[in-house]
């Protein structure tokens, strides 16, 4: 890959500048308030839609910006450096757009896609269950065919936007005998459908402002037209999106790490102890250097995965590497940033405190980092070491 293209090409510079302006002018002034109030930011998402950020990879003839995966992660990184929750929300919405555009029928896309792309509509994705997290084979939600309809029963937990969305992609077994790969189906369940119950909003450690709820389905009737694409394709459809989502998580992590480095450099330059700025002490210098090196290395891993995605090449290994490396480092950098800021870093008023809380989930969602290591171990065992 020609990385100079990512760094110097005018198109990418323009995209980075545009994302940086959006993040600094629209997102940054609201970031702290969003975290404190824990309220969703409809207006920011609407603005992101108007600017083409939500549908950045969607072809122009589908109403998107027609950009590539590298453009997508560039925007995510810039936004995450000011507000991880806004970046994470935009990443989730891009996933919903991708699912609908790749696998939806023409009627489904015509009805639902435009509102998602322009930021007026919101979707949710119901996958995780009380007994099914990393192991989706334990899924208990079922959609049993009864003549011309499917009867949906079960529950979902940790569903982002489940209480504010227009519709939900719900993963359910339609035929357990066919197993995980061929027996699961994604359904489009519209909000307000009889039999859908939405639980109270969860109180979270981080990503405050992104609502998280449980869902219950009680004999909820669905037509064949509610199937996303074709019956039995739910699991492969989701797996198809993970290369994108894991690369996006890497970008979120780099945004957090970059902010940690900036804050620490500024603080350590003005804070003095023993008649010297903190940045003059080798212990501090080495922590800052480690952040700088690991951010640069992580960005290369992220760009490699994004480049392969843009080329329509398989990049599961590269995406898992990027997600694992960048998210582990984001947590480490946020921890070290609190250490550098000392007692101030531990206060709610500290700029690091929110980043520390938001960083943790990057090691958990879109496949825990333990799962990423399992994936990479399998890849190493079967592929040539280059």
What is the role of each PLM region?
Residues 94-103:
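Helix-loop "lid/cap" segments that line or gate small-molecule binding pockets
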Residues 89, 116, 131-134, 158-161, ...:
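Short Gly/Pro-enriched turn/cap motifs at secondary-structure boundaries
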Residues 138, 192-223:
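Flexible, small-/acidic-enriched active-site or ligand-binding loops
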Residues 1-82, 86, 103-108, 115-120, ...:
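Alpha-helical interface subdomain recognition
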Residues 52, 76-80, 172-173, 189-194, ...:
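Short Ser/Thr-interspersed hydrophobic loop/turn segments at strand-loop and sheet-helix junctions
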Residues 218-237:
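Long, acidic (Asp/Glu-rich), low-complexity accessory segments flanking structured domains
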Residues 153-198:
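A short core secondary-structure module
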Residues 119-127, 171:
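A short, Trp-centered hydrophobic/proline-enriched beta-strand micro-motif
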């Amino acid at each position: 890959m020609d990385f100079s293209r990512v760094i110097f090409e005018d198109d990418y510079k323009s995209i980075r500048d545009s994302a940086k302006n959006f993040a600094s002018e629209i997102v940054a002034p609201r970031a702290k308030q969003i975290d404190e109030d824990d309220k969703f930011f409809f207006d920011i998402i609407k603005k992101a839609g108007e600017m083409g950020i939500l549908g950045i990879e969607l072809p122009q003839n589908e109403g998107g910006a027609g950009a590539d995966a590298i453009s997508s992660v560039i925007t995510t990184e810039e936004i995450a450096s000011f507000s991880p929750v806004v970046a994470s929300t935009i990443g989730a919405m891009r996933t919903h757009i991708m699912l609908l555009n790749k696998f939806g029928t023409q009627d489904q896309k015509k009805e639902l896609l435009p509102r998602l792309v322009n930021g007026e509509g919101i979707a949710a994705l119901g996958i995780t269950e009380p007994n099914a997290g990393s192991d989706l084979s334990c899924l208990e939600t079922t959609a049993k065919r009864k003549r011309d309809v499917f009867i949906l029963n079960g529950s979902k937990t940790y569903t982002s936007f489940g209480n504010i969305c227009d519709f939900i992609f719900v993963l359910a077994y339609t035929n357990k005998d066919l197993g995980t790969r061929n027996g699961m189906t994604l359904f489009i369940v519209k909000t307000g459908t009889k039999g859908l119950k939405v639980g109270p909003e969860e109180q979270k450690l981080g990503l405050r402002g992104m609502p998280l709820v449980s869902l219950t389905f009680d004999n909820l009737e669905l037509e064949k037209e509610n199937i996303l694409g074709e019956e039995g394709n739910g699991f492969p459809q989701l797996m198809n999106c993970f290369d994108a989502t894991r690369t996006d998580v890497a970008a979120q992590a780099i945004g957090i790490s970059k902010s940690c480095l900036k804050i620490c450099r500024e603080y350590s330059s003005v804070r003095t102890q023993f008649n010297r700025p903190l940045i003059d002490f080798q212990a501090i210098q080495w922590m800052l250097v480690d952040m700088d090196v690991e951010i640069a290395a992580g960005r290369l891993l992220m760009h490699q995965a994004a480049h392969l995605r843009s080329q329509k090449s398989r990049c599961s290994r590269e995406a898992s590497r990027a997600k694992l490396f960048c998210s582990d480092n984001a947590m480490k950098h946020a921890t070290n940033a609190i250490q550098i800021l000392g007692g101030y870093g531990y206060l709610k008023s500290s700029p690091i405190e929110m980043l520390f809380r938001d960083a943790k989930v990057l090691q958990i969602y879109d496949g825990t980092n333990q799962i990423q290591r399992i994936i990479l171990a399998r890849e190493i065992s079967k592929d040539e070491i280059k």
